[in-house]
Structure formats: structure tokens, C-alpha cells
């Protein structure tokens, strides 16, 4: 119970800070929360769950969410493309197989954890590519005032949520442009930064030895 109270207090401070930033610079809310989730989130995972009601309240009040879903959009689709870039660059069969499943989980299922824990944290350098891409996308999303018209707009299968019931074609176009930006930036950053995939070779050898 004490830990839960501490987490609630932490989440309240995070939300208050993000709201204060948005008061001064409305476009900066998304990049700030992306930065917090990719830094503080490393040692305090799960704080995003407490912020979901913010999106629900925004959808009820104004008909769209321009913060929480956009944050998820940047930090879920980006890992999918990071995995795709890793899969096409590596020569390790085990990593290719892992990256493919991670890519599909993120892009089609809206689940980023396989990429985060199975690729980014394990090899470290892809995490830097992920951070650069997600943060730069968040800045653009904030400047374009990207809006999601229902909860769940953080996978390619739900991209139509950016069109909305009133057919906001400009917003939908911006969402598609940002998806393209994440794709290009993911490939550029992964290939420029590189990665050491030797750990997957060791994992494959250990698995083979265990099978014997």
C-alpha cells in the first residue's frame, strides 16, 4: 500500500510537470513525456498506466487526445521500425527471428515491450536509435498538433483513429507522414549507430548445447 501511494504521488508530479510545460509551450508536452518515459521509465516502469485516465478525460471533453495516445504512437511504432532495421542488418538467424516477431508485435499489435527488452536493452545501441527517433517524432507531432480521436492509436492497424468521425484528413495525413518519418529515422539511426549482436550468437550456442 505504501509503494502504491508513492507511485500515485510520483505520477501526480509527472502529470503536473507535463501540464505546466504545455501551459508555456503546448507543442512540448509530447516530447517531454516521451523523454520522461524513456529515462525515468527505465527505473520506474508502469507510470504510464496512471496517465491513461488523462486520455480518457480528454476524449470525453474535447473529442480527441493530443498527449497520451501520441506518446504511445511515438514510442510503440518506433520500436517496430527499429526491429525491422535490426532484422535487415543482422546476419544472426536468432536475432532475425526475434526482430521479426518484435516488429510485428509493435507495428500490428501495439506492443513495444518485446523490442524494448529483447533488442534495445539487450544490445543497448538500438536503444539510442529508438530514443532519437521517438523523441524527434514527438517534437514533430507536438508542432503539428497531432490528435487521436479514440484510445488505441498506437499501431498501424488503428491508424484510422487519426482520421476521426469528422474525417480530419489533414490530421490523418500528418499521422501517415510521421509513420514515414519514424521508418526513415529508424533505419538511419540504426545503421549510423550500429549494434553488437554477438550476444545472440552466444544465446544460440547455449541453446544448441542445452538441446544436445
Located regions from the model:
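Membrane-interfacial loop-to-helix junctions in multi-pass transporters
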Residues: 21-34, 63-71, 169-173
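Transmembrane alpha-helix interface/packing and boundary motifs in multi-pass membrane proteins
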Residues: 35-48, 59-63, 106-109, 141
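Pore- and pathway-forming membrane helices of multi-pass small-molecule/ion transporters and channels
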Residues: 47, 51-55, 75-82, 104-109, ...
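Helix-loop-helix junctions within the multi-pass membrane cores of secondary transporters/permeases
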Residues: 56-134
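Transmembrane alpha-helical segments and their short flanking loops
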Residues: 114-212
Amino acid at each position: 500500500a505504501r509503494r502504491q501511494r508513492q507511485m500515485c504521488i510520483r505520477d501526480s508530479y509527472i502529470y503536473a510537470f507535463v501540464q505546466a510545460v504545455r501551459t508555456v509551450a503546448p507543442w512540448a508536452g509530447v516530447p517531454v513525456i516521451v523523454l520522461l518515459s524513456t529515462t525515468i521509465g527505465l527505473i520506474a516502469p508502469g507510470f504510464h498506466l496512471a496517465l491513461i485516465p488523462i486520455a480518457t478525460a480528454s476524449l470525453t471533453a474535447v473529442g480527441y487526445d493530443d498527449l497520451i495516445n501520441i506518446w504511445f504512437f511515438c514510442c510503440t511504432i518506433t520500436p517496430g521500425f527499429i526491429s525491422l532495421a535490426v532484422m535487415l542488418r543482422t546476419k544472426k538467424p536468432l536475432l532475425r527471428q526475434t526482430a521479426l516477431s518484435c516488429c510485428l508485435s509493435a507495428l500490428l499489435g501495439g506492443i513495444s515491450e518485446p523490442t524494448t527488452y529483447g533488442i534495445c536493452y539487450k544490445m543497448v545501441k538500438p536503444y539510442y536509435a529508438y530514443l532519437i527517433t521517438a523523441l524527434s517524432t514527438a517534437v514533430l507531432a507536438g508542432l503539428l498538433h497531432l490528435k487521436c480521436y479514440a484510445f488505441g492509436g498506437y499501431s498501424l492497424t488503428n491508424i484510422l483513429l487519426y482520421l476521426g468521425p469528422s474525417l480530419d484528413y489533414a490530421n490523418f495525413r500528418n499521422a501517415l507522414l510521421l509513420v514515414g518519418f519514424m521508418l526513415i529515422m529508424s533505419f538511419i539511426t540504426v545503421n549510423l549507430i550500429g549494434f553488437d549482436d554477438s550476444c545472440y550468437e552466444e544465446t544460440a550456442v547455449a541453446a544448441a548445447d542445452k538441446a544436445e
